[in-house]
Amino acid sequence: MAVALGSWPDGSPEWLEARRSRIGGSDIAAIMGLSPWQSRWQLWHRKRGTIDDKPSSDLMEAGHYVEPAAASWYADHHLPEGTWLRNTGTWVHRCRDWQLANPDRLIVDNPHSERHPVGVLEIKFTPNNPGQWGRDGTDNPPPHYWAQVQWYMDVFGVGWADVAVLSTWGFRCFHVKRNYEWLSLARHEAENFIAMLELGIEPDDSHEPAGRRYAIERLRHPDITDEQVTIDDPDAVNLIAKAAQLHASAKDASAEAKEYEDAAKDILAKYMGNARTAITPDGTTLATRRARKGRDGQPGTPFITLN
C-alpha cells in the first residue's frame, strides 16, 4: 500500500516541497518524452530550482472549480457498483519514497477508508480539441495523461484507472489498465533522471527547440544589471547578425505588405459597395466581404478579406 505524505492545496509551499525531489505523474510524462508542456531538460531545471515552478494558469484554475462536477458525473455514470470515491492527498510508493502520486480521487470498496483503493480516478478539464482525445469508453486518453495514471496505478498497486474529462463538447471517460512492461521502463528512466539531478548532470538539450531554450534562459535571469558582455565566438556573432538582418527585413516586408493591403481594401471598398465578392474578368475571386456576429447576435460592420 502507498504511504500518505499529507494533503495540501495544489501549488502550496508544502505541496511543491513534497514534489521537489520526487517524480510525480506529470513528471514521468516529461521524462518519457510524452508531455506537450515540458521536456526532460525543463523538468530538470525546475527540480534543481534554476527556474521557478510553472505558475497556475486560468485553465488550471478552471479545472479546480469543475473537478467536483466531473467527479459527480463519473459517480453517476461510471463508478463500479459497490465502490465509492474518496478525496485524497499526496502519496508515495511504500518502497520507493521518490515515486509520488497526487490523484484527484481514489476508488475504494470501503466507504470509510482510503487505505486499500481498487482504482484511481483522474479528472481533466479541456476547453476544446476533441480530436486530441479518443472515443468515450476507450483506453486511449492523450499519452501524457495515460502515463500519469500509469504512474499512479504503480504507486497504489492497483490494476486500473479511469480518466474523466469535461469539455465544451461534454463528458468522456477512459478506462486504462496497468501496463507493467512500460512501468518497468519508466521506473528505470526515473531513477536515471534522479541520479542526474543529484549529480548536477544536465540532460542533453540538443534536441530542444531554440525558442524553448530561450524561454528557459529568460526565466533563469530575471534581473538586468549594468554589466556588458563580449561575444567572441565568430559563428555566434554571424548567426546573431543574420537574425537581426532577417528580423529587420521581415519588419520592413510586413510594413510594406500592410500598406499594400490597406490600399487594396480602399479600392475594393469603393468598387464593392454592399456586394459580397469581387472578381476579375476571368472569374477569379479577388476579395470577400464578411461580418462577424456581435454579442447581441447581430452582424457587425462588414470587413474585406483578400483571397
Describe the role of every protein-language-model region.
Residues M1-N307:
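Accessory terminal regions of nucleic-acid processing enzymes
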